[in-house]
Protein backbone atom coordinates (compact mmCIF):
# COMPACT_ATOMS: atom_id res chain seq x y z
CA UNK A 1 0.00 0.00 0.00
CA UNK A 2 2.70 2.51 1.06
CA UNK A 3 6.29 2.33 -0.11
CA UNK A 4 8.90 4.90 0.95
CA UNK A 5 12.38 4.62 -0.53
CA UNK A 6 15.53 6.50 0.52
CA UNK A 7 13.53 9.54 1.65
CA UNK A 8 15.50 12.70 2.41
CA UNK A 9 13.55 15.73 3.64
CA UNK A 10 14.49 19.19 4.83
CA UNK A 11 12.69 22.22 6.25
CA UNK A 12 14.54 25.37 5.29
CA UNK A 13 18.24 24.54 5.58
CA UNK A 14 17.75 21.77 8.13
CA UNK A 15 17.74 18.15 7.01
CA UNK A 16 15.22 16.17 9.07
CA UNK A 17 14.77 12.80 7.36
CA UNK A 18 17.96 11.11 6.21
CA UNK A 19 17.47 8.17 3.88
CA UNK A 20 14.30 6.67 5.33
CA UNK A 21 12.79 3.43 4.04
CA UNK A 22 9.37 2.09 5.03
CA UNK A 23 6.96 -0.43 3.53
CA UNK A 24 3.37 -0.83 4.77
CA UNK A 25 1.08 -3.52 3.37
CA UNK A 26 -2.71 -3.30 3.28
CA UNK A 27 -4.20 -4.43 6.58
CA UNK A 28 -1.09 -3.74 8.64
CA UNK A 29 -0.63 -1.64 11.77
CA UNK A 30 2.79 -0.01 12.14
CA UNK A 31 3.98 1.82 15.25
CA UNK A 32 6.64 4.52 15.19
CA UNK A 33 8.56 5.16 18.39
CA UNK A 34 11.25 7.72 19.04
CA UNK A 35 12.27 10.70 21.17
CA UNK A 36 10.94 14.17 20.46
CA UNK A 37 12.63 15.79 17.48
CA UNK A 38 13.61 12.52 15.80
CA UNK A 39 11.51 13.16 12.68
CA UNK A 40 8.37 11.14 13.38
CA UNK A 41 5.83 13.92 12.86
CA UNK A 42 7.78 15.20 9.87
CA UNK A 43 7.31 11.83 8.17
CA UNK A 44 3.54 11.96 8.71
CA UNK A 45 3.32 15.49 7.32
CA UNK A 46 5.47 14.64 4.32
CA UNK A 47 3.30 11.65 3.42
CA UNK A 48 0.28 13.96 3.30
CA UNK A 49 2.22 16.66 1.41
CA UNK A 50 2.73 19.52 3.88
CA UNK A 51 4.26 22.40 1.88
CA UNK A 52 6.66 23.29 4.72
CA UNK A 53 8.84 20.31 3.85
CA UNK A 54 10.99 19.71 0.79
CA UNK A 55 11.82 16.24 -0.48
CA UNK A 56 15.42 16.41 -1.68
CA UNK A 57 15.71 12.74 -2.59
CA UNK A 58 13.68 9.56 -2.52
CA UNK A 59 10.18 8.39 -3.43
CA UNK A 60 6.78 7.91 -1.80
CA UNK A 61 4.40 5.50 -3.51
CA UNK A 62 0.80 4.91 -2.41
CA UNK A 63 -1.04 2.05 -4.11
CA UNK A 64 1.58 2.16 -6.85
CA UNK A 65 1.25 5.89 -7.51
CA UNK A 66 4.06 8.39 -6.92
CA UNK A 67 2.72 10.93 -4.43
CA UNK A 68 5.50 13.48 -4.60
CA UNK A 69 3.87 15.64 -7.29
CA UNK A 70 0.39 15.56 -5.71
CA UNK A 71 -1.03 18.34 -3.56
CA UNK A 72 -2.31 17.68 -0.05
CA UNK A 73 -6.00 17.60 -1.02
CA UNK A 74 -5.23 15.17 -3.85
CA UNK A 75 -3.52 12.81 -1.43
CA UNK A 76 -6.49 13.07 0.94
CA UNK A 77 -8.79 12.13 -1.94
CA UNK A 78 -6.60 9.10 -2.60
CA UNK A 79 -7.50 7.93 0.92
CA UNK A 80 -4.80 9.26 3.25
CA UNK A 81 -5.84 10.73 6.60
CA UNK A 82 -3.71 12.50 9.20
CA UNK A 83 -4.79 12.89 12.82
CA UNK A 84 -2.89 15.87 14.18
CA UNK A 85 -0.98 15.92 17.44
CA UNK A 86 -2.37 19.41 18.14
CA UNK A 87 -5.67 19.80 16.22
CA UNK A 88 -6.42 23.32 15.03
CA UNK A 89 -9.54 25.29 15.90
CA UNK A 90 -11.62 26.30 12.87
CA UNK A 91 -14.11 29.07 13.73
CA UNK A 92 -17.18 29.40 11.51
CA UNK A 93 -17.36 25.77 10.38
CA UNK A 94 -19.33 23.25 12.40
CA UNK A 95 -18.13 19.72 13.02
CA UNK A 96 -21.02 18.23 11.06
CA UNK A 97 -20.71 20.56 8.07
CA UNK A 98 -16.98 20.05 7.79
CA UNK A 99 -17.21 16.27 7.97
CA UNK A 100 -20.10 16.08 5.51
CA UNK A 101 -18.28 18.35 3.05
CA UNK A 102 -15.02 16.42 3.44
CA UNK A 103 -16.72 13.07 2.90
CA UNK A 104 -18.53 14.37 -0.17
CA UNK A 105 -15.28 15.74 -1.58
CA UNK A 106 -13.45 12.46 -1.03
CA UNK A 107 -16.16 10.11 -2.29
CA UNK A 108 -17.44 12.36 -5.08
CA UNK A 109 -20.96 11.37 -4.11
CA UNK A 110 -23.75 13.59 -2.84
CA UNK A 111 -24.32 13.01 0.87
CA UNK A 112 -27.89 12.81 2.15
CA UNK A 113 -28.06 15.29 5.03
CA UNK A 114 -30.46 13.43 7.32
CA UNK A 115 -28.82 10.04 6.84
CA UNK A 116 -25.39 11.54 7.47
CA UNK A 117 -26.64 13.29 10.61
CA UNK A 118 -27.98 10.02 11.98
CA UNK A 119 -24.73 8.15 11.26
CA UNK A 120 -22.66 10.94 12.79
CA UNK A 121 -24.66 10.98 16.03
CA UNK A 122 -24.28 7.20 16.33
CA UNK A 123 -20.49 7.49 16.04
CA UNK A 124 -20.42 10.38 18.49
CA UNK A 125 -22.30 8.28 21.02
CA UNK A 126 -19.71 5.50 20.72
CA UNK A 127 -16.92 8.03 21.31
CA UNK A 128 -18.80 9.62 24.23
CA UNK A 129 -19.07 12.96 22.43
CA UNK A 130 -22.21 14.91 23.36
CA UNK A 131 -24.56 15.31 20.35
CA UNK A 132 -24.57 19.12 20.58
CA UNK A 133 -20.90 19.12 19.55
CA UNK A 134 -22.02 18.33 15.98
CA UNK A 135 -23.26 21.91 15.67
CA UNK A 136 -20.28 23.52 17.38
CA UNK A 137 -17.42 25.09 15.45
CA UNK A 138 -14.61 22.64 14.76
CA UNK A 139 -12.49 22.27 17.92
CA UNK A 140 -13.35 25.79 19.16
CA UNK A 141 -13.46 25.67 22.95
CA UNK A 142 -12.90 21.92 22.98
CA UNK A 143 -10.74 20.42 25.72
CA UNK A 144 -7.63 18.47 24.71
CA UNK A 145 -9.46 15.18 25.16
CA UNK A 146 -12.47 16.39 23.17
CA UNK A 147 -10.21 17.42 20.30
CA UNK A 148 -8.56 13.99 20.24
CA UNK A 149 -11.91 12.17 20.26
CA UNK A 150 -13.03 14.49 17.49
CA UNK A 151 -10.02 13.34 15.45
CA UNK A 152 -11.20 9.74 15.82
CA UNK A 153 -14.71 10.84 14.84
CA UNK A 154 -13.21 12.22 11.63
CA UNK A 155 -11.31 8.97 11.08
CA UNK A 156 -14.44 6.85 11.43
CA UNK A 157 -16.55 9.19 9.31
CA UNK A 158 -14.12 9.54 6.42
CA UNK A 159 -12.94 5.90 6.53
CA UNK A 160 -9.61 6.38 4.72
CA UNK A 161 -7.36 3.69 3.29
CA UNK A 162 -4.32 4.84 5.28
CA UNK A 163 -4.60 6.44 8.73
CA UNK A 164 -1.64 8.42 10.05
CA UNK A 165 -2.16 8.94 13.78
CA UNK A 166 0.30 11.38 15.34
CA UNK A 167 0.18 10.96 19.12
CA UNK A 168 -3.60 10.87 19.13
CA UNK A 169 -3.36 9.57 22.71
CA UNK A 170 -1.11 12.32 24.09
CA UNK A 171 -2.38 14.27 27.08
CA UNK A 172 -5.31 11.92 27.67
CA UNK A 173 -6.31 10.20 30.89
CA UNK A 174 -6.69 6.43 31.08
CA UNK A 175 -10.41 6.41 30.27
CA UNK A 176 -10.00 8.73 27.28
CA UNK A 177 -7.15 6.62 25.88
CA UNK A 178 -9.42 3.57 26.12
CA UNK A 179 -12.11 5.36 24.08
CA UNK A 180 -9.60 6.46 21.45
CA UNK A 181 -8.03 2.99 21.29
CA UNK A 182 -11.43 1.36 20.79
CA UNK A 183 -12.25 3.90 18.08
CA UNK A 184 -9.06 3.11 16.15
CA UNK A 185 -9.76 -0.61 16.52
CA UNK A 186 -13.27 -0.07 15.13
CA UNK A 187 -11.74 1.63 12.09
CA UNK A 188 -9.01 -0.87 11.33
CA UNK A 189 -9.65 -3.88 9.09
CA UNK A 190 -7.93 -5.95 6.40
CA UNK A 191 -8.61 -3.29 3.75
CA UNK A 192 -6.86 -0.36 5.42
CA UNK A 193 -3.63 0.38 7.25
CA UNK A 194 -2.48 2.47 10.20
CA UNK A 195 0.78 4.17 11.10
CA UNK A 196 0.71 5.24 14.73
CA UNK A 197 3.12 7.51 16.58
CA UNK A 198 2.80 6.97 20.31
CA UNK A 199 4.63 6.99 23.63
CA UNK A 200 1.84 5.02 25.30
CA UNK A 201 1.33 1.31 24.69
CA UNK A 202 -2.25 1.49 25.97
CA UNK A 203 -3.59 2.85 22.67
CA UNK A 204 -2.33 -0.35 21.02
CA UNK A 205 -4.16 -2.78 23.32
CA UNK A 206 -7.01 -3.41 20.85
CA UNK A 207 -4.83 -3.44 17.72
CA UNK A 208 -2.74 -6.19 16.09
CA UNK A 209 0.65 -4.48 15.76
CA UNK A 210 2.50 -5.93 12.77
CA UNK A 211 5.66 -3.83 12.86
CA UNK A 212 7.30 -1.34 15.20
CA UNK A 213 10.06 1.06 14.17
CA UNK A 214 12.55 3.02 16.26
CA UNK A 215 13.24 6.53 14.96
CA UNK A 216 16.48 8.32 15.82
CA UNK A 217 17.94 11.37 14.08
CA UNK A 218 15.72 11.14 11.02
CA UNK A 219 16.25 7.44 10.37
CA UNK A 220 14.68 4.14 11.28
CA UNK A 221 17.44 2.46 13.27
CA UNK A 222 15.57 -0.73 14.14
CA UNK A 223 12.38 -2.49 13.08
CA UNK A 224 10.67 -5.46 14.66
CA UNK A 225 7.43 -6.73 16.06
CA UNK A 226 5.27 -5.53 18.93
CA UNK A 227 7.98 -6.54 21.38
CA UNK A 228 9.86 -3.34 20.50
CA UNK A 229 7.08 -1.32 22.14
CA UNK A 230 7.70 -3.16 25.42
CA UNK A 231 11.47 -2.76 25.09
CA UNK A 232 11.10 1.01 24.78
CA UNK A 233 8.68 1.12 27.71
CA UNK A 234 11.21 -0.72 29.89
CA UNK A 235 14.54 0.66 28.72
CA UNK A 236 13.91 3.87 26.76
CA UNK A 237 15.85 4.71 23.61
CA UNK A 238 19.42 4.56 24.95
CA UNK A 239 20.02 0.92 23.89
CA UNK A 240 19.00 1.75 20.33
CA UNK A 241 21.34 4.75 20.22
CA UNK A 242 24.19 2.34 20.92
CA UNK A 243 22.99 -0.05 18.20
CA UNK A 244 22.67 2.74 15.63
Where are these regions (language model features)?
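Conserved beta-strand-loop-alpha-helix hinge in the C-terminal portion
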Residues: 215, 219-241
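Conserved hydrophobic segment flanking the Walker A/P-loop of ABC-type ATPase nucleotide-binding domains
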Residues: 20, 24-26
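Walker B catalytic motif
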Residues: 167-168, 175
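The feature captures the beta-strand-to-loop junction immediately N-terminal to the Walker
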Residues: 33-35
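Q-loop/switch helix immediately C-terminal to the Walker
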Residues: 86, 92-107, 119
Amino acid sequence: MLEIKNLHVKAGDKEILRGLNLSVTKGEVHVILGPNGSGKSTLMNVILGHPKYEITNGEIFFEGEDLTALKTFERARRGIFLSFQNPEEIPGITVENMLRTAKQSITGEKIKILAFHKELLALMKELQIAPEYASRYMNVGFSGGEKKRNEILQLLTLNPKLALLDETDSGLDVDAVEIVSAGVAKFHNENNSCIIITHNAQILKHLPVNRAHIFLNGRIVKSGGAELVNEVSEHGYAPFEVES
